[in-house]
Structure formats: C-alpha cells, structure tokens
A protein has these predicted regions:
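Short, conserved charged micro-motifs
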Residues: 15, 72-76, 174-177
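Compositionally biased, proline/threonine/alanine/serine-rich low-complexity intrinsically disordered stretches
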Residues: 189-205
Length: 205
C-alpha cells in the first residue's frame, strides 16, 4: 500500500520558511528523520517514508508518505499519525535533532550550486516565489540561529493532523477493514483514472 496524509501549508514566501524546512528535516525530510526511522528502521514495514513541503507561491501541500507492506497498512497509518501528533507537543524537537537538521541543511548548500544551471535555478526561485533578494545569502546563518523553542512554536502551526486528508492506494479487499477501524472520517473510493466513484458502484469494486 502507498499512504499519503496531507493538508495545506503557508506559501514559501513566509517568515517561517527556513524554520519550516528545518522542522520538516527532523520529522520526515531525511533518512534519519522520525518517520523514516520509525517505519523503516524500527518497524521494517517500509523501504522509505517521510514528509514533504512542496514549494508554491500560494498555499502549498504538506504531506507524509509511506509505501508499506499491505498487511501493515492500518498499523503504518497509526504510526504516521503518532509521529505527526508527537512533534506538536508530546515529543518536541530535541537539541540533537535540531543540530543534525541544521548541519544537514547548511552543509548541503555547496552541492546545490555546483553548476551554472543550479545557480540559475536558485536565483529563479527567488523571483518565482517572491523570496527576499538576500534569501540565500542569509540562509545558513538563519538556519543556525534557530532554537528548540522556535521548533516548538512552529510545530503545532505547521503540522495539523486533524486537518489531514488521507489517501491510500492498495488492495482494497485486504486493507479496507483496518482503515475503517481507524475512524478517520468519511471514506471515498477513487478509480485508476482519478474519478470519485458513487457509493453504490464503489461497493462492487
């Protein structure tokens, strides 16, 4: 099964953008992030799972994703939900996690500008998303200046599991009962072409 859980997030051109990138790095943006360590390294239910914040001028998508074993679909959804909720309050970003995220984001910068095309793309992002002209000049310093308190203040504003829409692609006969047991809300069925099926016809597929 392939699991997605997402909701809207602020535009890229917002004062918290660098903090958002850092928080996402801890939650699901890297191999050592919480979501991947949980589902891949601990549970062994997925080859790779995480979270993404897409870039956009307006409201954009924040989502968790997890391709998992069919027989662990329900359990994986539960773990994803736990991670989304935990970082908001019960399990805030630790000092070690913040330090690792800061290192990951800043040390990656030289590799992102190895070619003229890459440099041009970064300059294009400034124009495309309405970022400050000094966005990349000050990026590393702003990442390094973030504190655990910044992460704790941002997490409940960025990560909103109660507003998430869940999308699960898989063998319905094997996963539907478990998903229903989670009581996440109304279930809609979508065919391979993206069409929402009426309840009557969905029942036979």
């Amino acid at each position: 099964s392939v699991i997605f859980a997402g909701h809207l997030a602020p535009p890229k051109a917002n004062p918290d953008e660098i903090a958002i990138e850092t928080l996402n790095s801890v939650l699901g943006g890297t191999f050592t992030s919480r979501v991947n360590l949980n589902l891949r390294e601990d549970k062994h239910w997925s080859y790779g799972a995480g979270t993404i914040v897409w870039d956009a001028r307006g409201q954009r998508l924040f989502f968790a994703y997890a391709p998992v074993q069919t027989d662990k679909t329900k359990e994986s959804m539960t773990e994803v939900s736990k991670e989304l909720r935990a970082i908001r309050s019960d399990k805030p970003v630790t000092g070690d996690e913040l330090t690792q995220a800061q290192s990951t984001l800043t040390l990656a910068l030289p590799g992102e500008w190895e070619t003229m095309n890459a440099v041009a793309a970064s300059l294009g992002n400034i124009v495309r998303f309405g970022l400050p002209d000094t966005y990349y000049d000050t990026y590393a310093d702003r990442v390094k200046a973030l504190t655990g308190r910044d992460m704790s203040a941002l997490a409940p504003r960025l990560v909103q599991p109660d507003h998430a829409v869940w999308v699960v692609v898989g063998d319905r006969a094997k996963i539907e009962t478990g998903i229903r047991e989670l009581n996440l809300g109304e279930i809609r069925y979508i065919d391979a072409d993206g069409r929402v099926l009426p309840a009557a016809s969905a029942g036979s597929r």
